[in-house]
Amino acid sequence: MSDYKSTLNLPETGFPMRGDLAKREPGMLARWTDDDLYGIIRAAKKGKKTFILHDGPPYANGSIHIGHSVNKILKDIIVKSKGLSGYDSPYVPGWDCHGLPIELKVEQEYGKPGEKFTAAEFRAKCREYAATQVDGQRKDFIRLGVLGDWSHPYLTMDFKTEANIIRALGKIIGNGHLHKGAKPVHWCVDCRSALAEAEVEYYDKTSLSIDVAFQAVDQDALKAKFAVSNVNGPISLVIWTTTPWTLPANRAISIAPDFDYALVQIDGQAVILAKDLVESVMQRIGVTDYTILGTVKGAELELLRFTHPFMGFDVPAILGDHVTLDAGTGAVHTAPGHGPDDYVIGQKYGLETANPVGPDGTYLPGTYPTLDGVNVFKANDIVVALLQEKGALLHVEKMQHSYPCCWRHKTPIIFRATPQWFVSMDQKGLRAQSLKEIKGVQWIPDWGQARIESMVANRPDWCISRQRTWGVPMSLFVHKDTEELHPRTLELMEEVAKRVEVDGIQAWWDLDAKEILGDEADQYVKVPDTLDVWFDSGSTHSSVVDVRPEFAGHAADMYLEGSDQHRGWFMSSLMISTAMKGKAPYRQVLTHGFTVDGQGRKMSKSIGNTVSPQDVMNKLGADILRLWVASTDYTGEMAVSDEILKRAADSYRRIRNTARFLLANLNGFDPAKDMVKPEEMVVLDRWAVGCAKAAQEDILKAYEAYDFHEVVQRLMRFCSVEMGSFYLDIIKDRQYTAKADSVARRSCQTALYHIAEALVRWMAPILSFTADEVWGYLPGEREKYVFTGEWYEGLFGLADSEAMNDAFWDELLKVRGEVNKVIEQARADKKVGGSLEAAVTLYAEPELSAKLTALGDELRFVLLTSGATVADYNDAPADAQQSEVLKGLKVALSKAEGEKCPRCWHYTQDVGKVAEHAEICGRCVSNVAGDGEKRKFA
């Protein structure tokens, strides 16, 4: 028996079946680094229109977690897809390097500044620590396959960036947005510092809730207001609070102007409450016998005075819109030094912003004899006892509620009025302009717009000062007596910035005021405060984007971070850019959800459900992680677990197998010599290229819309359905058995080549390592890297005007599906083994019949059977299977007649008809020894 195997064009490629990504990727990365791939891309894209995705700086502390990976991979997919779309899209990664978490780490090791080390040495240790953290995170980000200028990232602690942060503040001062004031800010007594809103978390806490009576100073005036005379005992206005410790700072009682307030007679006294809350208050304080003597609107009680229960002064009733009927009494204890609403209304009424609490959370001397020096959280019981002693306590109970806590210490924080510096939201129209700018930005998903609008509309002035050691100094001089800023503040700040640019922030603390103030130095003091770390990152549009040469003066097109950054980086960047330049720092803002486990639970070390990106990369490879990110809808929570990653690995295998099939069947194909012109190609091959063209249109549209899960779904459909279960199956016969250099085979290879050129580019932004690997095996002259090129433009398709157009092949796909069902049933019934053992008769109505007949003898190749006949629908025998999909089709199956050809495996009547090749069929004889078969359609 002759060996005809050598006459077959069997697939062959060095591209491995298994990805072995965890082992192979590091080698690819080494090559990317050695070649300076990022530099090669920049050179290739020079002069193209720019797309700038500005990196929100992660905090330089700790290892990267799965959320970091999601963020960096999404950014990388966008940057790479923009590159393929013809943009120059430089990516400069950054890190946030100042701030409290780093200080705390250094404190843990070396003690607080001034203990073992001077403040200057402490800052040097902080800088050193941040640098080691940056190095650790950088290695992991690079391992993810993220391309960027990793050798020259921006760090907020770079001397030049520190100087530019000071300049940004100078510009804001110049535009009139800064003011100083004693104002209640979130204050952590453990940090001994003000906290930004983004540094506050909420946890459940048990507090004492109390109802307290403030007795009226002028009882007769109140009786007159309520038009009553028969009141038994003193009249009091009752407040309700969950922070008894703030009562020493009480300076007023807020009531709502439009609510009805009732004068209620109870045993031995009368109390004033919101009418709608009388019943609930009476239940709470345990009073069943009460009488409503009269009612008035809150506005009637404005400026009547009430005696503080133990502080020895009286306070006014004032009108406030923040009073609600949700809980309490309808009268709100108001301490302007301990709450933002209280502060705002206090300013309106000219109240003192009293703050009796020191930075460590204890009452200052002279507050009240039994409270001086006591920690406020331990003072509640003392205050309650005082109220009881004075007869002012109506009720006390414990209640569980959500309470603001320090994000770092997880301990409760307080509002505390301190002298701070603020960026004003309203004194120069910053709020109004910011709201206007928001409307000009594209928010992805679009609900982000309403979210940030509501935050900007309702946010207080931004407290930008901190009392910390490791941070950018505010670099201000204030007059010793008046505390006014120096008249030459902007000039002085630029002088400081120049020094910081050379020596870093330490230059400010080393600066002797005489050096730049001369004789005025005796009248001015240096402001010791540092800037809120959110000011550092929020000013990078100016301190980084505006000055990096690769951005060439272009503003950022996109900011992309987790959805918590509406209140964080997106907000601080918007505030600073609008205050400096009058415009938003970005054109598009994309947010992604948080990662959760397979059951939708938040990731937590204590539950043990965290997924380590390092582990995933070491076991499965970065491309699997990247594919999971891309295939997950980032607009909601992003679920990840071993099972979910396993599914991503399965999808990856399907894509890889498709790529491998293409490469293996391009064996011996040289596009420069072997390409077949479209008009000479087999129709099915042109259809396949057209499928790729349609897929590319969908995929590019999805990349453009940042719908990466759509990209993956379309890619999978193309690989699994259009190629895997139809086209690639059909062409195996022609590809393997036709003459090696025949038009029939070269047509097929031409299609595979076009498809591979397109596919490798679709993959590149997501499966970057695998695309690079595929690229290396593609035939023909090409650039060294897929990332320097653009989307493939060599695709074409069938014209609608052709008889065998896309609609024709869509119908054929359905026919093939129906035939497959019949074959599967026959296999289950043991009537046939493989599909080539079958011959089918298609009983079709005239329109479909004409289409099927048009394929002639090539219909069997489309159906993967050894025989295929078309007959009249009405002639179908009773056992023919009626199609559920195509009403005008019935399918009958019989065993194929003839012998099996050992070369092509088809059953035919002409095996052995040619004496020189007695074992094979006539078609194979033609392909081995003759001119080769001609294929026109399939």
From Swiss-Prot:
Question: PANTHER family from the xrefs?
Answer: ISOLEUCINE--TRNA LIGASE, MITOCHONDRIAL, SOLEUCYL-TRNA SYNTHETASE
Protein name per the record: Isoleucine--tRNA ligase
Q: Does the keyword RNA-binding apply?
A: no
Give me the residues that bind ATP, please.
605
Record: residues binding L-isoleucyl-5'-AMP: 561
Where, in this chain's numbering, is Zn(2+) bound?
Answer: 901, 904, 921, 924
The annotation note on the cofactor reads:
Binds 1 zinc ion per subunit.
Q: Is Metal-binding there in the keyword field?
A: yes
Where it sits in the cell: the answer is: Cytoplasm
Q: Name one Pfam family in it.
A: tRNA-synt_1
Alphabetized UniProt keyword annotations: Acetylation, Aminoacyl-tRNA synthetase, ATP-binding, Cytoplasm, Ligase, Metal-binding, Nucleotide-binding, Protein biosynthesis, Zinc
Disulfide topology: none
Its domain comment says: IleRS has two distinct active sites: one for aminoacylation and one for editing. The misactivated valine is translocated from the active site to the editing site, which sterically excludes the correctly activated isoleucine. The single editing site contains two valyl binding pockets, one specific for each substrate (Val-AMP or Val-tRNA(Ile)).
Instruction: Give start-end ranges for motif 'KMSKS' region.
Output: 602-606
* Role of this protein: Catalyzes the attachment of isoleucine to tRNA(Ile). As IleRS can inadvertently accommodate and process structurally similar amino acids such as valine, to avoid such errors it has two additional distinct tRNA(Ile)-dependent editing activities. One activity is designated as 'pretransfer' editing and involves the hydrolysis of activated Val-AMP. The other activity is designated 'posttransfer' editing and involves deacylation of mischarged Val-tRNA(Ile).
N6-acetyllysine PTM positions read 183
